[in-house]
Amino acid sequence: MMKTLTISAACLINDQGQILLVRKRGTSKFMQPGGKPEHGETPIETVMREVFEELGVKFDVKDLEPYGEWNGPAANEEDTSIQAYLFAARFNGSPEPLAELEELLWIDPRDALLRDDIAPLLKEHVLPALLANTHDLGA
């Protein structure tokens, strides 16, 4: 039986219009920073905590804009779908991969669409939405 995970993730966009993607240790797919809520957390509280744990970056609530809610297959777990709450923010730092992260990648969304190592939800929903709203990319 398919289970559903709820997650919150961040679309961090720099001034060059690139999105920051992360790859967790022991996995092959890049995705946005983020994760599952702890008990009682709202989606925005979850994304703020996860971004701090994974990248050491603190955002205020006012810095993060709700960017949509999508459902799709989980990248690293079989028979699992995810319900993802996304938040977008401008970010130009050079974070270090912390916690369970192995690798960080700043990439143009157009280039990310051509890669095989991008999480399904990102490739099918988030990147096309970003490209359809080019003002979000600073383009």
Regions found by a protein language model. Name each.
Residues 30-34, 107-109:
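A short, polar/proline- and glycine-enriched secondary-structure boundary/capping micro-motif
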Residues 12-13, 21, 89, 106:
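Conserved hydrophobic "DFG−1" position in protein kinase catalytic cores
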Residues 86-88, 96-129:
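NUDIX/MutT-family hydrolases
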Residues 5, 69-96, 109, 133:
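Active-site-adjacent beta-strand/loop module that shapes the phosphate/pyrophosphate-binding cleft
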Residues 24:
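Short loop/turn segments immediately following the C-termini of beta-strands
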